[in-house]
Swiss-Prot record:
Compartmental location: Mitochondrion inner membrane
Binding site for heme b b566: 97, 196
Gene3D superfamilies associated with the record: Cytochrome Bc1 Complex, Chain C
Record-stated family: Belongs to the cytochrome b family.
Example GO biological process: mitochondrial electron transport, ubiquinol to cytochrome c
Pfam families registered for this protein in UniProt: Cytochrom_B_C (PF00032), Cytochrome_B (PF00033)
Listed PANTHER family: CYTOCHROME B (PTHR19271:SF16)
UniProt keyword terms in alphabetical order: Electron transport, Heme, Iron, Membrane, Metal-binding, Mitochondrion, Mitochondrion inner membrane, Respiratory chain, Transmembrane, Transmembrane helix, Transport, Ubiquinone
Summary of subunit composition and partner proteins: The cytochrome bc1 complex contains 11 subunits: 3 respiratory subunits (MT-CYB, CYC1 and UQCRFS1), 2 core proteins (UQCRC1 and UQCRC2) and 6 low-molecular weight proteins (UQCRH/QCR6, UQCRB/QCR7, UQCRQ/QCR8, UQCR10/QCR9, UQCR11/QCR10 and a cleavage product of UQCRFS1). This cytochrome bc1 complex then forms a dimer.
Function field: Component of the ubiquinol-cytochrome c reductase complex (complex III or cytochrome b-c1 complex) that is part of the mitochondrial respiratory chain. The b-c1 complex mediates electron transfer from ubiquinol to cytochrome c. Contributes to the generation of a proton gradient across the mitochondrial membrane that is then used for ATP synthesis.
Name of this chain's protein: Cytochrome b
More about this protein: Heme 1 (or BL or b562) is low-potential and absorbs at about 562 nm, and heme 2 (or BH or b566) is high-potential and absorbs at about 566 nm.
Keyword Coiled coil on entry: no
Length: 379
């Protein structure tokens, strides 16, 4: 009799995806982050569901409903902080996952890479709308500033912004629709993740050397299931340390003040994971130019397969490209720091230089380093 794992129509799909999946024998811990992202998504959906049971999406009661969750609901405080800091863990894993794809040339799987970019945009939209829901000062002003950027679109901008707001300012209608979208988007993300995996399993995983590994595969279970569990334990350790010792470390103190349209906070800034894009936005004095740079800072990922000039797939044996890659990482960290600073000297000029460097490294220096390395191979 055939094993039910291999014959049952539903279990068979799971078997081919997570159990009998042929995986390269040499993939490193940088390949753990895909599964960690899946865990983060499940955690966010579950904690979010329990929060939604007690949250009210009305401007008059939203702030106090979050306070009620933390004070009166059984273990509400831990659910709330797991959800808030879980988002930070999600983005840490996301950035490492994308960085891994860049470093090891995984972007040559075009469909998987492009679905990944769509996923990145969707997760960012979800996180932004989630940040608005507690209806604190930074929630309200963050929503006002970021949605207002759409008014830079010629001709239809102002109409579009008012359509998104559901009125002439960020108000009850905005909060209600943001809650609705924040609830539905994680399920759309889950569907996209399935498509992402479907395309990945068409080609099989990449590996650190970038060389096809068809002749050297091992089953996913038990080797990589055990390896993923280790990564998961470290993720849980980090998340629980954050939640139980310093839950507000990554938040903004202004968000503990209820939203007040008549009082602007001294420094409006988004959550830490958007600061790099926010710094790029602010570094351009023109509104439309800033918005375009903001979108392009992430959309540029779609150009990377086209900009791949190297004869080798991975950066494992390409020291020049490695230097450019780590410069890019350092530049993104600089942009993240600048995004959280006030708009004054010397932060403005540092932000502008870091923004120019960001686009230059991707568009000029990466292909240039690859071309030089190709020529060095001839010697």
């Amino acid at each position: 009799m055939t094993n039910i794992r291999k014959s049952h129509p539903l279990i068979k799909i799971i078997n081919h995806s997570f159990i009998d999946l042929p995986a390269p024998s040499n993939i490193s811990s940088w390949w753990n982050f895909g599964s960690l992202l899946g865990i983060c998504l499940i955690l966010q959906i579950l904690t979010g569901l329990f929060l939604a049971m007690h949250y009210t999406s009305d401007t008059t009661t939203a702030f106090s409903s979050v306070t009620h969750i933390c004070r009166d609901v059984n273990y509400g405080w831990i659910i709330r902080y797991l959800h808030a800091n879980g988002a930070s863990m999600f983005f840490i894993c996301l950035f490492i996952h994308v960085g891994r794809g860049l470093y090891y040339g995984s972007y040559t799987f075009l469909e998987t890479w492009n679905i990944g970019i769509i996923l990145l945009f969707t997760v960012m939209a979800t996180a932004f709308m989630g940040y608005v829901l507690p209806w604190g000062q930074m929630s309200f002003w963050g929503a006002t500033v970021i949605t207002n950027l759409l008014s830079a679109i010629p001709y239809i901008g102002t109409t579009l912004v008012e359509w998104i707001w559901g009125g002439f300012s960020v108000d009850k209608a905005t909060l209600t629709r943001f809650f609705a979208f924040h609830f539905i988007l994680p399920f759309i993300i889950t569907a996209l993740v399935v498509v992402h995996l479907l395309f990945l399993h068409e080609t099989g995983s990449n590996n650190p050397s970038g060389i096809p590994s068809d002749m050297d595969k091992i089953p996913f279970h038990p080797y990589y299931t055990i390896k993923d569990i280790l990564g998961l334990l470290l993720l849980i350790l980090l998340l629980l340390t954050l939640v139980l010792f310093s839950p507000d470390l990554l938040g903004d103190p202004d968000n503990y003040t209820p939203a007040n349209p008549l009082s602007t906070p001294p420094h409006i800034k988004p959550e830490w994971y958007f600061l790099f894009a926010y710094a790029i936005l602010r570094s351009i004095p023109n509104k439309l130019g800033g918005v375009l740079a903001l979108i392009l800072s992430i959309l540029i990922l779609a150009l990377i397969p086209t900009l791949h000039m190297s004869k080798q797939r991975s950066m494992m044996f390409r020291p020049l490209s490695q230097c450019v890659f780590w410069l890019l990482v350092a530049d993104l960290l600089t942009l993240t720091w600048i995004g959280g600073q006030p708009v004054e000297h010397p932060y403005v000029i540092i932000g502008q230089l870091a923004s120019i460097l960001y686009f230059s490294l991707i568009l000029i220096f990466m292909p240039l380093a690859s071309t030089i390395e190709n020529n060095l191979l001839k010697w």
